[in-house]
Curated annotation (Swiss-Prot):
PANTHER family: F-BOX DOMAIN-CONTAINING PROTEIN, OS07G0183000 PROTEIN-RELATED. This is Putative F-box protein At4g17565. Residues 16-63 form the F-box domain. CDD domains: F-box_SF (cd09917). Signal peptide: none annotated. SUPFAM superfamilies: F-box domain. The lineage of its organism: Eukaryota, Viridiplantae, Streptophyta, Embryophyta, Tracheophyta. It comes from Arabidopsis thaliana.
Length: 378
């Protein structure tokens, strides 16, 4: 018998460590992975992360939730928690992102990107998955003496970014003025024609370069951002059935609010949100504009689609594990930010709320959260 067969370490020498696998072999495996699984693989070790560069995963179609930390002795302010719905029993903690999230506010999301505003009045775009960061012109270029509102309650802004070229557009209303900046700008530009208030919701449709504004009393204005000087394009009929007032009905008190969403066909729909304070219950109604009558009519079902309210988008949800069709993904928006009952998936078929798993809510003391859709493009 060969004496080498008696050596107990012989097998250890011929079997390589998983962290030392050939990069070409790793890449051939990574290219077969879904977006979610590829991002998991990147976190295994440095060599896997390096080998994954350049790999294009299958397009992600599942909304994720990111939870931002509270300022606490037990919390790290530089890490966030990620929840992926097809991993119902676990959460993921991001690497140190070099950002003090406890003193920052997420104003908007687009794909994997977050539009952040910190206590130093800096705005920047951050990708928590790739660690990429794009610093925007400092807000003092708008007005160095401006007194800023509490953005925990006034988060009217919209973000669009191209994942490859990193071209971007950020539209940011401050009080009764509207400012915007694009890739290559070294300052914020004033849009004098756009009368957008910080309480007004705005969404951006890159396909037609239009910003849609939901203003007071249900008016919807459309602004054209295809040129360097934005201008009003048109306005849609008033959504008269929605208001933002408090309503009392005997012992039941609830608040009506609204959000605009882009449909799969590129049309604006309006989501009516009703919050019953005494019952901790929420209800949602969806309305679309009838092009013939120019009236808003109720939509009974989304069919095989779902709404991600934080992003103002509708996505396909047919036969996709991890996303629920005919549902609305909701994270509370401007409601009490740390209330776990404000984060759920609303089933339009049954009119019920599906809460987040306990592992998500107990993962950290959070100050805010957002649904986002890694890999999304429009």
């Amino acid at each position: 018998m060969d004496q080498s067969d008696k050596n107990p370490n012989r097998r250890l020498r011929v079997i390589p460590k998983w962290s030392e696998l050939c990069p070409d072999l790793l890449r051939s495996i990574f290219e077969q992975l879904s977006f979610t699984n590829l991002n998991r693989a990147k976190l295994v070790c440095r060599s896997w992360n390096s080998a994954s560069r350049g790999c294009v995963p299958k397009r992600n179609q599942i909304p994720w939730m990111i939870l931002f930390p509270q300022k606490s002795e037990n919390n790290s302010s530089n890490n966030c928690v990620l929840f992926v719905p097809d991993d119902n029993d676990k959460v993921y903690k991001t690497r140190d992102l070099g950002v003090d999230f406890a003193q920052s506010i997420c104003l908007a999301t687009y794909g994997s990107w977050l539009l952040m505003f910190n206590h130093l009045r800096n705005l920047y775009i951050l990708n928590p998955l790739t660690l990429e960061r794009i610093d925007l012109p400092h807000s003092t270029s708008i007005n160095p003496n401006m007194c800023y509102p509490n953005f925990k309650y006034y988060r009217s802004a919209c973000l669009w970014i191209n994942n490859i070229t990193k071209d971007y557009l950020v539209v940011w209303p401050i009080y009764n003025k509207c400012f915007f900046t694009k890739k290559g700008d070294d300052t914020w530009r004033f849009a004098p024609a756009c009368h957008i208030r910080m309480k007004d919701q705005i969404i951006y449709n890159h396909k037609d370069h239009k910003v849609y504004q939901y203003a007071s009393y249900g008016f919807i204005y459309v602004w054209d951002f295809s040129s360097d000087i934005p201008h009003v394009d048109k306005h849609l009929p008033a959504v008269s059935f929605i208001s933002g007032r408090e309503i009392g009905d005997k012992n039941k008190y609830y608040r009506i609010s609204h959000q605009m969403v882009m449909s799969l066909s590129g049309e604006v729909v309006v989501v009516k949100i009703m919050h019953y304070y005494d019952l901790s219950r929420w209800r949602f109604r969806i309305f679309e504009l009838n092009p013939l009558t120019q009236r808003w009519v109720k939509v009974d079902s989304l069919g095989d689609a779902a709404i991600i309210l934080d992003m103002g988008i509708t996505v396909v949800a047919k036969d996709i594990p991890g996303i629920k069709k005919n549902s609305i993904y909701f994270s509370g928006l401007n409601h009490p930010l740390t209330d776990p009952e404000c984060r759920f998936v609303y089933d339009l078929t049954t009119g019920t709320m599906e809460p987040l798993p306990q592992c998500v809510l107990s993962s950290m003391l959070f100050s805010d959260s957002r649904w986002f859709l890694p890999g999304f493009t429009s």
